[in-house]
From Swiss-Prot:
It catalyses: Endonucleolytic cleavage to 5'-phosphomonoester. It is an enzyme of class 3 (hydrolase). GO terms for cellular component: cytoplasm. It is found in: Cytoplasm. It comes from the Bacteria. It comes from Rickettsia canadensis (strain McKiel). The active site is at 50, 122. Its main location: cytoplasm. The gene is rnc. Homodimer. This is Ribonuclease 3. Coiled coil: none annotated. Its EC number is 3.1.26.3. Residues 4-133 form the RNase III domain.
Length: 227
């Protein structure tokens, strides 16, 4: 399993049961091949990892943001467990290089598919949890998500709501979002969205329309703050 050594170094964790690590990185496309049909893929681990990630992030926020109410904590958690953030964590670990998939999935762009990266990241969290304990998993998630948790400005967590509130407070019409471009394959598209409030315009790019809208709103808020 030497090919996973670098990944384990980035995680700061060495698996006792390497089969769990392999399962966490096995794409469902493998079941299409007879030689792999009895092998496990990451779908069940992804299900567990999603729950573990939500629990750990909730605990971290509850401990670190004592002055925030339930609504603000929910906004921050939503940002920390969204596809965009999970994919950024997966990118830090270079997970796309470790996912085990069929040749067909790979040539179709599977290594750059945000869904695959998100699913493998969540499955990896579950594998760590099953291989160790909740305390170890908590520490690893805390390290991997540290740069995102440090963001203190609620505007960065929920920029669309913040932009809407700014528009209402300034007696402007509500923000208008328009999809202006979609690029890439169907399963790995990037979207470009334009947001407009009065005479202000800004674009945002993301792996989904929702993500692109949030990025556009965040960029416009930063621009308004600096004007």
């Amino acid at each position: 399993m030497s090919s996973f050594n670098e990944l384990e170094k980035l995680l700061g964790y060495s698996f006792k049961n390497k089969e769990l690590l392999i399962e966490a990185l096995s794409h469902p496309s493998l079941r299409q091949h007879h030689e792999y049909k009895d092998n496990k893929d990451y779908e069940r681990l992804e299900f567990l990892g999603d729950a573990v990630l939500n629990l750990v992030i909730t605990k971290i926020l509850f401990s670190n943001f004592a002055s925030y109410n339930e609504g603000n904590l929910a906004k921050i958690r939503s940002y920390l467990v969204c596809k965009e953030t999970i994919c950024m964590v997966g990118a830090k670990l270079a997970l796309k290089d470790y996912i085990i998939m069929t040749y067909g999935e790979e040539v179709a762009g599977g290594r750059d598919n945000p869904n695959n990266i998100e699913n493998a990241t969540e499955a990896l969290i579950a594998a760590i949890y099953l291989d160790s304990n909740i305390e170890t998993t908590h520490n690893i998630i805390g390290q991997l998500w540290a740069e995102f948790i440090k963001v203190q400005n609620l505007t960065d967590y929920d920029p669309k709501t913040a932009l809407q509130e700014w528009a209402q407070a300034s007696d402007h019409h509500l923000p208008i979002y328009c999809l202006i471009k979609r690029e890439g394959a169907a399963h790995s598209s990037t979207f470009t969205v334009l947001v407009k409030v009065k005479d202000y315009e800004q674009i945002g790019i993301g792996y989904s329309i929702k993500e692109a809208e949030k990025n556009a709103a965040r960029s416009l808020l930063h621009r308004l703050k600096n004007d």
